[in-house]
A protein has these predicted regions:
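Alpha-helical membrane-associated segments of multi-pass integral membrane proteins
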Residues: 91-125
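Juxtamembrane loop-transmembrane helix junctions in multi-pass integral membrane proteins
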Residues: 1-8, 29-35, 56-63, 91-94
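Loop-to-transmembrane helix junctions at the membrane interface
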Residues: 51-75
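Hydrophobic transmembrane helix segments
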Residues: 9-46, 77
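Alpha-helical transmembrane segments in multipass membrane proteins, preferentially the mid-helix core
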Residues: 46-55, 113-118
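Alpha-helical transmembrane segments of multi-pass integral membrane proteins
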Residues: 8-20, 70-78, 105-113
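Cytosolic juxtamembrane helix and N-cap/initiation of the first transmembrane helix
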Residues: 1-17, 116-128
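Interfacial non-cytosolic loop connecting adjacent transmembrane helices
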Residues: 25-38, 76-104
Length: 128
């Protein structure tokens, strides 16, 4: 059961990284995102892909996946709450509600991945 959960998490990780990377490049090309943020998100996606590939090759990379999902969770939380703040202060563009919805979905997906990877990395053996 644990191995099947790792494989499902690896597939979720690959899908999330691909969707996130495409979304970041679309955001950068349409709205001119700050370039260091783009590199930071690309680094997080690279870390997610490395963790997913390691999990698909064999067990034992759940800690790496947990760190990668934690980084993705932090980044998506930051962007989600910044978009919500801009929307509440009425200084958001016309597409702000759609952006907030997309960031909310990314926030939920990253939270799910982080929670599953954290529960998989929890030590199950009794301490001596």
């Amino acid at each position: 059961m644990r191995r099947k959960t790792e494989i499902a998490l690896a597939v979720l990780t690959l899908v999330f990284a691909l969707v996130h990377l495409v979304g970041e490049f679309a955001l950068h090309s349409t709205r001119g995102q700050f370039l260091p943020f783009l590199w930071l998100h690309c680094g997080a996606d690279l870390l997610l892909v490395c963790a997913a590939v390691r999990m698909l090759r064999g067990p034992g990379a759940v800690g790496l996946a947990c760190g990668a999902w934690g980084l993705a969770f932090g980044l998506s939380a930051t962007w989600f709450f910044q978009a919500a703040l801009r929307l509440m202060e009425n200084r958001a563009p016309a597409s702000a509600e759609m952006d907030l919805t997309l960031w909310g979905l990314a926030f939920l997906a990253a939270g799910l991945g982080f929670g599953v990877s954290l529960s998989l990395s929890w030590r199950r053996a009794p301490l001596p």
